Amino acid sequence: MRLNIAIFFGALFGALGVLLFLVAFGSDYWLLATEVGRCSGEKNIENVTFHHEGFFWRCWFNGIVEENDSNIWKFWYTNQPPSKNCTHAYLSPYPFMRGEHNSTSYDSAVIYRGFWAVLMLLGVVAVVIASFLIICAAPFASHFLYKAGGGSYIAAGILFSLVVMLYVIWVQAVADMESYRNMKMKDCLDFTPSVLYGWSFFLAPAGIFFSLLAGLLFLVVGWHIQIHH
């Protein structure tokens, strides 16, 4: 009975981990950024450029924000304009700087982002393989497949942990947003570009938790079957 309960919760946590990882992988809201279009101390309305990016795409669109409105709601699907500009995120690794980058720092950023992208792809592959192994293990009660699936879930959790850690380093250091901020403030002293982590970013830690938990449960199941059968 306890073995069946462990398998059930392992499958539940594994499914949640897979779902969260795939949504985080496929959505383009890892980073949310706003950039002022013009500054005016006399008006309460500002034209702002909104940026959001993920693994595949980086998109931006223009909007108007009133003084008491929150910029974050402009990124909600229903509040976005019907058309917006998008480019491949790998080819444009900075959330702002379209054509305004230093070639050396840009090349380094592309390499760093490429490494981050490879880790994310490996994490997605690992969690899909883990799910396949667990599905195959269930009919045969194979301790080897359960342990292999559990190990793959743990590997996926570790890989996505590295993805999250590298993305934080990316935003805080590698993207060199401070230089861009200083450049823009020459024209607009009263405005600082805003950069926030998006909901896609926060899905990844939740997926990591469920993936690691599922992996540990399936390892225990595999060891239990090996010892008692």
Swiss-Prot record:
The keyword Iron-sulfur does not apply. The keyword Cell membrane applies. Residues 136-153, 222-229 are cytoplasmic. Pfam families: Claudin_2. It is a multi-pass membrane protein. The chain crosses the membrane at residues 115-135, 154-174, 201-221. Glycans are attached at N47, N102. Disulfide bonds: none annotated. Gene3D superfamilies: 1.20.140.150. GO terms for cellular component: plasma membrane. One of its GO terms (biological process) is myotube cell development involved in skeletal muscle regeneration. It comes from the Eukaryota. Residues 27-114, 175-200 are extracellular. Residues 49-59 are annotated as: Interaction with ITGB1. Its main location: membrane. It is found in: Cell membrane. Residues 1-26 form the signal peptide. Keywords: Cell membrane, Glycoprotein, Membrane, Myogenesis, Signal, Transmembrane, Transmembrane helix. Interacts with ITGB1. Negatively regulates myogenesis and skeletal muscle regeneration via its association with ITGB1. Modulates ITGB1 activation by decreasing ITGB1-LAMB1 interaction and inhibiting ITGB1-mediated intracellular signaling during myogenesis. Belongs to the TMEM182 family. This is Transmembrane protein 182.
